[in-house]
């Protein structure tokens, strides 16, 4: 087992801080660990985890660590890798991943059990797949796979491989290493795929910035305007548009509308437009039998003061 560590310069501290603070404005960037795993199959009982990639902040530098089970002669290689990873992950408050609630975390827990390791408590989970899927009305994507989200956000990757294709590459790597062959190509291919998967997670975190629209406590300023519009029957109506300034920008404009309202989010400006319905506001008394209705004045009064009104000008209130 080996641990490969490199410094990243692909994102700035302040950019990522603004996005993560939109999720939790009291957390520090150093509280978050981004991770992704590579396995030889989907079933934890019939396969193994051979690579775990992590990105984190260390002294204002972003670091990628890749825990790689690369020793074919060591039957405890995966066990050592899992132990090192869990020790490292225990120092963080949040663990960020893509669909890890369904696959990565349950898979690792099962592999730890199979390898005879004690049960470990993972940091608080942030699943970017779930966060993206919850915004499907705004994003309107054909699916919510990681590469689809990356394309939507304008994220480019060097790796063109599929995780499933790399299973054979890993097997070729182990076989070649055992036979003393040059396996540099396979080694680089395995690390590159995991590198791009995990290094793109902070960029995918931009989806968290769209959740600002539900948190009115973060609104920096709010204004509104009233204009003329038309209902579906072409009758003129008034429309009200709220303009709300948000704390950080979103990477891509989105919008959604239906019969009741229209919403558009562009950079850090949220606009919500809806029709103003003009009608008579009514209040229903639960104890209406204790009231009289005054037809001439068109309002109700309690029986306790009805003695001051002529009987001809009042009638018992009805439900």
Predicted features along the sequence, with ranges:
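DEDD superfamily 3′-5′ metal-dependent exonuclease/proofreading module
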Residues: 1-35, 40-47, 57-60, 65, ...
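Short beta-strand scaffold segments in enzyme catalytic cores
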Residues: 52-54
């Amino acid at each position: 087992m080996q641990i490969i560590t490199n410094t990243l310069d692909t994102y700035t501290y302040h950019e990522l801080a603004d996005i993560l603070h939109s999720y939790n404005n009291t957390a520090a960037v150093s509280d978050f660990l981004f991770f992704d795993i590579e396995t030889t199959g989907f079933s934890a009982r019939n396969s193994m985890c051979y690579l775990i990639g992590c990105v984190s902040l260390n002294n204002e530098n972003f670091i990628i660590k890749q825990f790689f089970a690369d020793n074919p002669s060591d039957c405890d290689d995966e066990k050592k890798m899992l132990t090192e990873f869990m020790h490292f992950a225990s120092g963080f408050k949040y663990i960020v991943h893509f669909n890890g609630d369904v696959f990565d975390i349950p898979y690792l827990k099962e592999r730890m059990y199979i390898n005879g390791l004690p049960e470990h408590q993972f940091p608080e989970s942030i699943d970017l797949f779930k966060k993206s899927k919850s915004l499907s009305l705004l994003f309107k994507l054909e699916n919510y796979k990681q590469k689809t989200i990356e394309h939507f956000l304008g994220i480019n990757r060097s790796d063109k491989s599929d995780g499933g294709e790399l299973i054979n590459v890993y097997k070729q790597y182990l076989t070649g290493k055992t036979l003393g062959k040059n396996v540099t190509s396979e080694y680089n291919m395995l690390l590159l795929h995991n590198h791009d998967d995990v290094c793109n997670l902070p960029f995918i975190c931009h989806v968290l910035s769209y959740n600002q629209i539900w948190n009115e406590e973060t609104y920096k300023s709010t204004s509104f305007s009233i204009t003329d519009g038309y209902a579906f029957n072409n009758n003129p109506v008034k429309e009200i548009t709220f303009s709300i300034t948000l704390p950080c920008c979103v990477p891509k404009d989105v919008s959604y509308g239906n019969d009741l309202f229209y919403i558009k989010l562009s950079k850090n400006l949220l606009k919500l437009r809806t029709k103003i319905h003009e009608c008579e506001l009514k209040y229903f008394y639960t104890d209406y039998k204790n009231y009289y209705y005054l037809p001439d004045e068109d309002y109700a009064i309690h029986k306790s003061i009805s003695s001051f009104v002529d009987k001809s000008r009042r009638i018992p209130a009805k439900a």
